[in-house]
């Protein structure tokens, strides 16, 4: 038996005051010291459609925990909507919020002696922030996200009915052929329900990754927020966290702890799945940060190794025609994992919050196996309801059948891949000696090799300007620098630039490179996370207009056609002048300066530098 963390304050004269406060907050004296305190880390927020319904989720989870024999204690953390923050200085705050969210959850759980944790995230930085906290705390933890939004249904001016999502309205913004009336039609129809944005963007990628790593139940990444089955998932997750809390404290079973689940092998499985489904490049940042929180030796080199050996077998929006509901119908994350298992790409001896091995889980939840349960087959039939409403659980609509077509369906088998290369790739060269990342699933085959002159800007705002005023021409490589973790600061996303080049009709004719990052909704030849970043004296700071940029995705290379001697000469010139300073007007708040002071480059997950923190604090 392992003593509950809350035991220290639930008995003895010294902590009578703490117990008095717990009583005042609604905890029964009869439960104190007998039932585990389950912290509910919610992220309800009326700014985000992905989080607007989470207050209701929190109530469901709380009641289910109480019924299962736990003491639920709900609290809230922040949530930044990247789509709303996009394209202006609000985006500087998005990535830094990840680390603050992690701190918030750690502070709350440790300050109040929580015995276990259930996390209710949904959107981009909330999921990894809570994952980082769970791995730091290492107490019994279950994740259950709010669920993805349904895709929109938009009737175009010519009468065509099109499946749409948020990215479509952003493309339309820069398309001179789209009238204001048509743009308003997109605006009203592309986001029809609550939930995280409908494609395989960052939020859904991270929720899928959480399921793959073993900290969430099947369906977490793909059951729509609007479907009644999502409500069932919340109840099951709540009961599961109480169950594993008892396993740990009553039976001393530490296999249920996050660090026991999220091992090196589990990280490799999660990244293998991510590469196979062509997830957001942001997942690279977040999985590196998570590994550091778990003290797991998983680096960009591991991601590079995996990307060479795993093909892309699922191309969802924005890289392909499938929406998240289509991926769900094809078996969801266990469907993708099942195909990877048959190809020998997974460690199936890893365990999760609900199964002793991945192999056992796939036996029950992989729709291609004869042993797949009726419960699983029914769950994966959950379909869109096409009811425009911010309310969750509005329908019980089911598909007539499952998508088991592994040649032309939403999920392919390993013998019929969408792309023989993985959906994500790490590139290196004299422009990014420490690496950079590209979502190969979203790059048209004709520009996997690219050579062209650079057009250099020092901010996203400048990038948008040169795109919209047609300074960026076909054949050019747009280099956006000083947007890294330290240089931005905050490493903002470049969704507007990638969307606007598509709106201008040159998405297949230009390259884009940045030490910042891209939205999960970005596609095209968009290379991000260049490391070292410009503000850390990276070579990207030395590039000038007209320099020839050479990119070869198959060879995993990204270079500028300059000799080492020429680069050294430019470095001397730069350091004799202004130095590594962006030429732009941007106010940077004290909060962002604090982030910049400790931020590491993207190849380290853009996390705070632990060595610098230890040095300055004087604490081990």
Curated annotation (Swiss-Prot):
Pathway as given in its UniProt record: Amino-acid biosynthesis; L-isoleucine biosynthesis; L-isoleucine from 2-oxobutanoate: step 3/4; Amino-acid biosynthesis; L-valine biosynthesis; L-valine from pyruvate: step 3/4
Catalytic activity: (2R)-2,3-dihydroxy-3-methylbutanoate = 3-methyl-2-oxobutanoate + H2O; (2R,3R)-2,3-dihydroxy-3-methylpentanoate = (S)-3-methyl-2-oxopentanoate + H2O
Manner of cofactor binding, per the entry note: Binds 1 [2Fe-2S] cluster per subunit. This cluster acts as a Lewis acid cofactor.
An MF annotation (GO) of this entry: 2 iron, 2 sulfur cluster binding
Post-translational modification N6-carboxylysine, affected residues: 125
Protein keywords: 2Fe-2S, Amino-acid biosynthesis, Branched-chain amino acid biosynthesis, Iron, Iron-sulfur, Lyase, Magnesium, Metal-binding
Domain of life: Bacteria
Cofactor(s) needed: [2Fe-2S] cluster; Mg(2+)
EC number(s) given by UniProt: 4.2.1.9
Active site residues of this protein: 519
Biological processes annotated in GO: isoleucine biosynthetic process; L-valine biosynthetic process
Broadest EC class assigned to this enzyme: lyase
Recorded GO CC terms: cytosol
Keyword Metal-binding applies: yes
Positions with a binding annotation for [2Fe-2S] cluster: 123, 197
Pfam families associated with the record: ILV_EDD_C, ILVD_EDD_N
Binding, Mg(2+): 82, 124-125, 493
UniProt record similarity statement: Belongs to the IlvD/Edd family.
Assembly and interaction partners: Homodimer.
Entry function: Functions in the biosynthesis of branched-chain amino acids. Catalyzes the dehydration of (2R,3R)-2,3-dihydroxy-3-methylpentanoate (2,3-dihydroxy-3-methylvalerate) into 2-oxo-3-methylpentanoate (2-oxo-3-methylvalerate) and of (2R)-2,3-dihydroxy-3-methylbutanoate (2,3-dihydroxyisovalerate) into 2-oxo-3-methylbutanoate (2-oxoisovalerate), the penultimate precursor to L-isoleucine and L-valine, respectively.
Protein name: Dihydroxy-acid dehydratase
Lineage: Bacteria, Bacillati, Actinomycetota, Actinomycetes, Bifidobacteriales
């Amino acid at each position: 038996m392992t003593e509950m963390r809350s035991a220290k304050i639930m008995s003895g004269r010294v902590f009578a005051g703490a117990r008095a406060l717990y009583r005042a907050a609604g905890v029964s004296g009869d439960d104190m010291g007998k039932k585990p305190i389950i912290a509910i880390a919610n992220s309800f927020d009326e700014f985000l459609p992905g989080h607007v319904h989470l207050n209701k989720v929190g109530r469901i989870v709380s009641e289910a925990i109480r019924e299962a024999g736990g003491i639920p204690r709900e609290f809230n953390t922040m949530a930044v909507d990247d789509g709303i923050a996009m394209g202006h200085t609000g985006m500087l705050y998005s990535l830094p919020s990840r680390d603050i969210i992690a701190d918030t959850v750690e502070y709350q759980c440790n300050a109040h002696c929580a015995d276990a944790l259930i996390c209710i995230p949904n959107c981009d930085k909330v999921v990894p922030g809570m994952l980082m906290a769970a791995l730091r705390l290492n107490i019994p933890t279950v994740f259950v996200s709010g669920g993805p939004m349904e895709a929109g249904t938009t009737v175009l001016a010519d009468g065509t009915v099109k499946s749409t999502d948020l990215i479509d309205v952003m493309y339309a913004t820069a398309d001179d052929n789209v009238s204001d009336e048509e743009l308003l039609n997109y605006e009203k129809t592309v986001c029809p329900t609550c939930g995280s944005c409908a494609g395989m963007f960052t939020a859904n990628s991270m929720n899928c990754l959480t399921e793959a790593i073993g900290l969430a139940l099947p369906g977490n990444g793909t059951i729509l927020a609007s479907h009644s089955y999502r409500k069932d998932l919340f109840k099951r997750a709540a009961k599961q966290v109480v169950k594993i809390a008892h396993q740990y404290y009553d039976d001393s079973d530490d296999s249920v702890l996050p660090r026991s689940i999220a091992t090196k092998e589990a990280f490799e499985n999660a990244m293998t799945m991510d590469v196979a489904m062509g997830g957001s490049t942001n997942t690279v940042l977040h999985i590196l940060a998570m590994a550091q929180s778990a003290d797991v030796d998983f680096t960009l080199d591991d991601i590079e190794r995996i990307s060479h050996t795993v093909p892309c077998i699922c191309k969802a929006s924005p890289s392909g025609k499938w929406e998240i509901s289509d991926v769900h119908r094809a078996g969801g994350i266990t469907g993708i994992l099942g195909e990877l298992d048959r190809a020998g790409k997974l460690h199936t001896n890893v365990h999760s919050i609900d199964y002793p091995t991945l192999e056992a889980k796939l036996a029950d939840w992989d729709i291609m196996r004869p042993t797949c349960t009726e419960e699983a087959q029914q769950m994966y039939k959950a379909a869109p309801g096409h009811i425009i409403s911010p309310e969750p659980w509005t329908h019980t609509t089911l598909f007539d059948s499952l998508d088991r077509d592994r040649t032309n369906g939403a999920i392919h088998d390993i013998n019929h891949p969408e792309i023989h290369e993985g959906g994500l790739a790490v590139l290196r060269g004299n422009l990014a000696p420490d690496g950079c990342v590209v979502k190969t699933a979203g790059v048209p085959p004709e520009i996997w090799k690219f050579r062209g002159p650079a057009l250099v800007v020092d901010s996203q705002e400048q990038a948008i300007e040169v795109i919209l005023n047609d300074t960026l021409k076909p054949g050019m490589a747009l280099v956006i620098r000083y947007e890294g973790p330290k240089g931005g600061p905050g490493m903002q996303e470049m969704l507007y630039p990638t969307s606007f080049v598509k709106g201008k009709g040159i998405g297949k004719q230009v390259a884009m490179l940045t030490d910042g990052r891209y939205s999960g909704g970005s596609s095209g030849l968009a290379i991000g996370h260049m490391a070292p970043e410009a503000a850390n004296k990276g070579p990207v700071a030395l590039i000038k207009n007209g320099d020839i940029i050479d990119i070869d995705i198959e060879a995993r290379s990204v270079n500028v056609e300059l000799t080492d001697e020429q680069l050294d000469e430019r470095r001397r010139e730069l350091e004799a002048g202004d130095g590594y300073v962006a030429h732009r007007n941007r106010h940077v708040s004290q909060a962002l300066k604090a982030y910049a002071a400790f931020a590491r480059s993207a190849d380290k997950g853009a996390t705070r530098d632990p060595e610098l923190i230890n040095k300055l604090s004087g604490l081990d």
